[in-house]
Amino acid sequence: MSRYMNPSYRSLKPYVPGEIPRDRTFIKLNTNESPYPPSPGVIAAFTADNAKLQRLYSDPASIDLDRAIAGAVRVRQENIMATGGSDEALELAFMAYAADGIAFADETYGFYRVLADLHDLDTRIIPLRDDFSLNPEDDYNLGRMIVIANPNAPTGLYLKPDVIEDIIRHNPDHVVVIDEAYVDFGNESVIPLIHKYDNLLVTQTFSKSRSLAGARIGFAAGNAALIEDLERLRNSRNPYDISRQSQLAGVKAVEDAAYYRDLCVRIVRTREWTMRQLKALGFTGTDSCANFVFVKHPDFPGEVIAQKLREKGFLIRHFNKERIKDYNRITIGTEEEMEALVEALREITGHDKNS
């Protein structure tokens, strides 16, 4: 670190992304990307927007993309703001609404803590129960902004809309942000509640269910006044946050919703199959409602499982945190990838069919 670094940031602990392999080929099950390609319409959008157009700035308001998303989730365009991934929407919310502080679970998306530290926010950590479920009453009347990942990461646990609504009702003077990065895997969104509660902000991403992690597309949904707040901040820091090609691809992804719904059904089916196989090998875990499983084995530390799988050509996500150090988060890949993973785990745990 240089001597010129702002003292406010010298102790900052940046977010640590999942490993991106560069020197060999792995089956990559560590960052919850879709194992399937984008829809044909999206692929065509990427090839159609030729190099000549790249000399022009993208639409800073992302009007076409906002309109498409609004139609898909059945709200007015004024209730939607497309962003450069849902992480941008989350950061803008932290900037806009956490003057009194921020609250989130002890085991959740690690970027929340990074954003809180980056913006020097008064942070309250809400401990989850022993089974990693959230006690809704722990989020009542906190006097600060609340952010909840639903389904949660890395646990995959899901809170039904009536539970979320109860939390919103008990925090009428502060914004409640619901991060729905994994909502498409068989769960119900709370976006319809934005018409009932002016303090509800919902974020989603195109990185998981829509096979567009590399395009960096997300959005925020909320009361028109909340969206105006976020737009004011966005346009004060990075008005051209979504590239031309990403905006075109995002519109096509929304139009090709049936293609992505089928992929989500396929991923959920593979997730359930994978969990049955892992239980047969002695693993236990949460009842995940996302595109990953969160599991541990009684005889092998989580770090050992992750390392042995890496040696066999698989990348999964191990978190070096005391409470979850025995667990690993494993992204659901294709059927063939998960069959190969289960076979590798049979060998690691001593359940090899040939032994």
Short names for language-model regions:
Residues 1-56, 142:
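N-terminal "arm"/small-domain region of PLP-dependent enzymes with the aminotransferase-like
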Residues 61, 199-279, 283-286:
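PLP-dependent aminotransferase class I/II
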Residues 63-101, 119, 299:
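Phosphate-binding glycine-rich loop
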Residues 76-80, 101, 180, 198-199, ...:
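Short acidic capping loops at alpha-helix termini that bridge into adjacent secondary structure
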Residues 95-149:
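PLP-dependent aminotransferase-like
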Residues 128-184:
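Active-site phosphate-binding strand-loop segment of PLP-dependent enzymes
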Residues 162, 308-312, 317, 321-355:
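PLP-dependent enzyme catalytic core of the Aspartate aminotransferase-like
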Residues 268, 280-312, 328:
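Conserved PLP-binding catalytic core of the aspartate aminotransferase-like
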